[in-house]
Amino acid sequence: PTWALNLFDLLIDLYNEPNMHEGQWGYGTVHHVAFRVSDDEHQRAILQRLRDAGHDVTTMKDRNYFHSLYFRDPNGVNFEIATDPPGFLHDESVDELGTTLMLPPFLQDRRDEVEAQLADISV
């Protein structure tokens, strides 16, 4: 059996085995598949198509650099619909991109904890 999803004028056809056990999270598994859309208006149109087709879709999540919606396929894989705006240049210039760790506002108070988990990278 297959599960078809028509988004962005692109047909996504996935194999669905209803009696198979859902996989476990860990190394080598897919956490989510993200699709890019041009803006919030395009995202709202896709949200409506998904809901009209009976899918359970999250409300819009503001990820500081983009806006996201999430839903799952019958196998439990999480799909994301993410907008281009506001983009990565809304809080730093092209010349500064990647020179510091930029965190969304909700993680700023945990900066030390987040940075302590990152491995040093030399370029």
Task: Name each model feature, range by range.
Residues 58-62:
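Conserved S-adenosyl-L-methionine
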Residues 63-67:
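Short acidic/glycine-enriched loop/turn segments that link adjacent beta-strands
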Residues 2-56, 72-123:
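Glyoxalase I/VOC metalloenzyme domain signal
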